[in-house]
Amino acid sequence: MTGVQTCALPISTGPKIAEFEQTVADYVGAKYAVAISNGTSALHAACFAAGIGPGDEVITTPLTFAASANCVLYCGGTPVFADVDPKTYNIDPKDIRRKITDRTKAIIAVHLAGQPCDMDAIHSIAHEYGLIVIEDGAHALGSVYKGKKVGSLSDMTTFSFHPVKPITTGEGGMIVTDNEEFYKKMALFRSHGITRDDSMMTRNDGPWFYQQFDLGYNYRITDIQCALGCSQMKKLDRFLARRKEIVARYNEAFADCDNIITPYQLSDTESGWHLYIVQVKNCDRRQVFEAMREKGIGVNVHYIPVYMHPYYQEHGYENVHCANAEEIYSHIISLPLYPGLTSEQQDYVIDTLKSLCGE
């Protein structure tokens, strides 16, 4: 008998995780990456590494998925909502400054739809007040700000690999950073705060030994998922190029439409175009939305301002109002945008929306 192994294949934790982390880190230009179970856990880990806790405030946008604010609550902190720029729909640095108090510890900047935020202005404010900057790049893998990819700009950046994102691992997420301390904290956090690293442990009783140093979570991603992620990364630039082609056709089709407002693109940025969000004017948004769904078109709305959700209304946010975010929310519809969308399908979307909006 030659011996018995406990497991023949590294299905849960294996070499593809490190390979995927290195691939994404190299792509965006970051030193370190931590692959994790999903985009929400990535935000949670980033807030944990930033030291967010009770009494701390974190400024973020209301025009986002709830996870961008919930991650602050998970750590015991308080989300504070700054209004958005009416053109880009991203967080407005001027309102960030207005919302800063002596309890502010960090800013979470969300690159809505893949359009990068005004990071120079945000970094200037963060430097002035000694704040940590976390970028929620769930929509923005491949997006570029002034010649640099999102993921190389701030203290930490999170990504999501949900099925509708630029690439997918089924479910999955990642945090990238140049800060070794943040990296080590997040690597522990995703696996119960446990390590087998001799350089960190206070003692070692044998090959079986491990120690827990933080109250972490089981946020591990599997080797199988990361193998898919490695394959997807080889296709990312092709996916992004196709998204840009679709966006260009939408922009051209709606260029002369008074009742359809197309996304604003900053001249010194490149959006990853996760979403194509239009505003419909002089017509009933709900009627347009429901009619398009009835015609088999998968439209959506991104997003309901976070503080308008019942949970937030019942927990101290009932008097919060961000005028720009609420005005934008009342008019927006997200049109289908994915690499497999055909020109014929897109023409059907365009013609249907124009007809419903009186164009």
Ranges and model annotations:
Residues M1-L9:
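Short, small-residue-biased leader/transition segments that mark boundaries at the very start
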Residues P10-E57, C71-C75, F81-D83, K148:
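Phosphate-binding glycine-rich loop
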Residues P15-T23, Y27-K31, K94, A106-V110, ...:
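PLP-dependent aminotransferase class I/II
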Residues V34, I59, V80, V133-I134, ...:
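Structural detector of well-ordered beta-strand residues that form the stable sheet scaffold
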Residues F48-G137, V144:
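PLP-dependent aminotransferase-like
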Residues N90-K99, G147-M156, Y348-L356:
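A short alpha/beta connector and helix-capping loop motif
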Residues E135-T168, K184, W208-F213:
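Conserved active-site segment immediately N-terminal to the catalytic lysine
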Residues S152-R196, D223:
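Active-site PLP attachment segment
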